[in-house]
Amino acid sequence: MKIALINENSQAAKNGIIEAALKKVVEPMGHEVVNYGMYAADDAAQLTYVQCGILAAILLNSGAADYVVTGCGTGEGAMLALNSFPGVICGHVEDPVDAYTFAHVNDGNAVSMPFAKGFGWGGELNLEYCFEKLFGFGHGQGYPKERVVPEMRNKAILDDVRAATFKPLIECLQSIDQDLLKGAIAGEKFSELFFASCKDEQLAAYIKTLL
């Protein structure tokens, strides 16, 4: 699994801590971490939590990433931004139980975490434990396990409802403020990382017109 890490500007200084915790846990599982930044608070490209949602949607819908880990001060804003787009089901994860139940009950493809609220001494340990529960035990197996059939049925219903209520991502991108969109893909390593992994030629062609 290719896991993308995205940080917005208010918590960008923690990018290295988050990346280290994520890699420590998931690389031994065989997963790959791709860090899209922000990398530091003074990066030239400043991402807001709204732009985290835009970038996450581009990565997931294009196949450039299989999963996105992101967040903000509380994790709420980034979660709302990600869930504004088709092809993204983002959970709010504060602790390992959140991580495990989201993976097995909701079976989404992104999480948003609080990187300021409650992030004190031992914060990196909580990240590691969350990532272990999120990525170490599979997905969609139900919790409790005897509830797996109705839970996955509800997940399929949610997918159908979202398919009916969202328009294709490229139409979403064409409809939003183009300066906002350009800012979301302005990271110093975006082009290098994205085009090497993008599987959607139409989306890639559109993104190239914005760079």
Map each language-model feature to its residues:
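Short Gly/Thr/Asp-enriched flexible loops that form oxyanion-binding sites at enzyme active sites
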Residues: 77-90, 94-97
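Short, structured active-site "lid" loops
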Residues: 49-67
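Short glycine/serine/threonine-rich phosphate/pyrophosphate-binding segments
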Residues: 14-15, 53, 75-81
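A short beta-strand-loop structural module common to alpha/beta enzyme folds
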Residues: 29-45
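Short, solvent-exposed amphipathic alpha-helices that sit
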Residues: 14-29
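C-terminal binding/interaction regions
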Residues: 4-17, 100-210
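A short, small-residue-rich loop immediately preceding and capping a beta-strand
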Residues: 65-71, 90
